[in-house]
A protein has these predicted regions:
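Active-site-adjacent structural elements that line small-molecule/cofactor binding pockets in enzymes
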Residues: 1-176
Length: 176
């Protein structure tokens, strides 16, 4: 909270961590940025939010599987630390943080990833068909994000170069 208040007081923008839910942005981040801005006699609407998003695209479950697994692993990794684990509790997924922390210490990466259910993934990522991805990004972040960064996209393109034009279409749709 302190750094969000400081950003509200002093900064032109905030680069949000990819491990976020809209609940976190709405109920934790934005109020603190607004408090800092108010303390400095600034308007918080002038502070830009750059938001990396775990975006998992594909026209079939099979096509999305690799990116879903990667996003779940990242969410589990970040969520295993106290700095991010509270977000699970905020969403009603109690005791996920301590479970992830224990599994991380044990080095059980398969169980770590399996702890992040599809329901949890949907809170921290956008999972969609290619044709729906831009609309889902816009629906979730319009009026909140100044910029969206699709996290893990470079990795996806590295695995599947044919996806580059599709990610380009999404970027154009989101920025238009």
């Amino acid at each position: 909270p302190l750094m969000c208040r400081v950003a509200g007081e002093l900064c032109d923008g905030v680069h949000v961590h990819p491990m976020h839910s809209m609940h976190y942005i709405t109920n934790r981040l934005l109020p603190q940025v607004a408090k800092g801005a108010s303390d400095a006699n600034r308007n918080s609407s002038e502070i830009e939010l750059m938001i990396p998003v775990f975006a998992v695209a594909g026209d079939s479950e099979e096509e999305r599987d690799a990116m879903k697994a990667r996003a779940k692993t990242q969410i589990a990794f970040y969520g295993s630390t106290p700095n991010y684990a509270f977000q699970f509790d905020d969403l009603g997924f109690e005791n996920i943080g301590p479970t992830l922390n224990k599994l991380m210490r044990e080095g059980d990466l398969n169980a770590l990833q399996a702890t992040i259910t599809d329901e949890i993934l949907e809170e921290f990522a956008i999972v969609a068909n290619w044709d729906d991805m831009a609309d889902k990004l816009i629906a979730r972040y319009q009026g909140v994000a100044s910029r969206i960064i699709t996290y893990l996209t470079a990795e996806d393109i590295g695995r599947n170069p044919k996806n580059l034009p599709r990610w380009g279409e999404i970027a154009r749709a989101v920025t238009s």
